[in-house]
């Protein structure tokens, strides 16, 4: 049975999930966290390494000659040098689609927090705002309906499609920026360009993977062409935006709000520009982390391992 080492298990399973489906397939060693300086020592005898955010570089791969398989406990696998892994005969598998519903739900939660101001009014009422009112309904800033409002989605993978489905229920006008043919998009979703999305939408929501080509594509130039007061939502990757440009657009009012579950550096430094910018709604990378979604990750990783050991690897990204 293979020697299996999980390098950073804590965020996936702080104690509420069972490792049994993985442990039954090999000798499993689980570390809650692994500093980069200890990766090689801890994985030296491993044939299978499981990781979430621990980085595996070509240099590290060269020092792990027994390694045959890397299981990424996530959909995104940019923490692994997959080209170097392939060149060294190491298979890399990810976990696709485990969190489609969870992330789509969180996207709507962030969006509705901005438009419906739930947190804002809850805080005002804790301060006695409503109790002092002479009227049954009291508001100082109106909430917004999404019916007829243009919401543009950048990327139409599983999550983007699910968000589109939810928005259509609320009768929003949903547009998509995607390389896919318009005929393949969900009913009622129209394909537009990136410039058109930022210039004509009330809300833009990011749902694309991070690549070197689109890193920080939401930059000062794009934001200068955006509709005044645009609401930007990001549950994809923090590095898709230029932090300084977005912070400055929030300061100037060019952006009306930025609601995100991801930042370019996680955890962020205390002086991260997004954290102190006005009209930001930041959650600490929790969209994926429902108990149901985390349980699916463990199950699919176990299925990936079983398939690999049977000689028919699945969900291969290398």
Give residue spans per PLM region.
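Rossmann-like dinucleotide-binding domain for NAD(H)/NADP(H)
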Residues: 92-93, 229-318
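Rossmann-like adenosine-cofactor binding region
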Residues: 56-61, 173-175, 180-273
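N-terminal Rossmann-fold NAD(P) dinucleotide-binding loop
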Residues: 160-161
């Amino acid at each position: 049975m293979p020697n299996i080492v999980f390098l950073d298990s804590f965020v996936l399973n702080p104690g509420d999930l069972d490792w049994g489906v993985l442990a039954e397939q090999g000798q499993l060693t689980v570390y809650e966290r692994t500093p980069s300086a200890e990766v090689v020592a801890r994985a030296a005898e491993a044939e299978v390494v499981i990781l979430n955010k621990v980085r595996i570089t070509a240099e590290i791969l060269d020092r792990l000659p027994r390694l045959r398989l890397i299981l990424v406990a996530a959909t995104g696998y940019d923490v692994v040098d997959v080209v170097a892994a392939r060149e060294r005969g190491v298979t890399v598998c990810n976990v696709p689609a485990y969190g489609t519903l969870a992330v789509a739900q969180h996207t709507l939660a962030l969006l509705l927090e901005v438009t419906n101001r739930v947190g804002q009014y809850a805080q005002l009422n804790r301060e006695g705002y409503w109790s002092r009112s002479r009227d049954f309904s009291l508001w100082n800033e109106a909430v917004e309906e999404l019916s007829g409002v243009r919401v543009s989605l950048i990327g139409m993978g599983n999550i983007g499609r699910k968000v589109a489905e939810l928005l259509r229920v609320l009768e929003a006008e949903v547009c998509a920026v995607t390389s896919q043919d318009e005929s393949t998009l969900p009913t009622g979703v129209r394909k537009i360009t990136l410039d058109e999305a930022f210039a004509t939408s009330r809300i833009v929501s990011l749902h694309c993977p991070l690549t070197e080509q689109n890193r920080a594509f939401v930059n000062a130039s794009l934001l200068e062409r955006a509709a005044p007061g645009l609401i930007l939502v990001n549950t994809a990757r923090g590095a898709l935006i230029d932090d300084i440009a977005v912070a400055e657009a929030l300061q100037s009012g060019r952006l009306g709000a930025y609601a995100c579950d991801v930042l370019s550096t996680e955890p962020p430094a205390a002086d991260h520009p997004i954290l102190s910018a006005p009209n930001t709604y930041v959650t600490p990378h929790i969209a994926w982390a429902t108990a149901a979604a985390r349980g699916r990750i463990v199950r699919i990783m176990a299925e990936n391992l079983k398939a690999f050991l049977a000689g028919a690897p699945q969900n291969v990204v290398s």
